[in-house]
């Protein structure tokens, strides 16, 4: 599977999640023996999210994922045979502030030193900066099926998009040409 961030047409299309997001949270909480109901209550979110009676926006989805990672004590959310220690993402995000260029910051964001492998890279192609996630050799945990991996790769793309937007302090939809997502099963591209 390869994911490439090159663009996104309209960031507003990413404001509401589908039923897959809720189902993923429920499955993850169950597999980790964590109460999703308690997490929703602690975060002040309506419990009707579980029954899909109220929408779940992406910000709240990522807040719930963060809380699950704390409960599980693994920022990879049980996806890797090499769990990520709590604080890993905060460490990487804090380190971005010291970078002098957006290119250097995006290269730091690639997380390679944490994942112990060359799964992410940043390339300059003509005048385009390309962030590539290549997880072909990533040490996925045995319980990670292809659908779950694809779902999480899409979330990684959204997360990286948000981080880059924060770094330049502006929506990046105007600066990016396309978002491309490929797996062995499917290919999705937004222009």
What kind of region is each of these model predictions?
Residues 1-132:
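N-terminal low-complexity or simple alpha-helical regulatory segments
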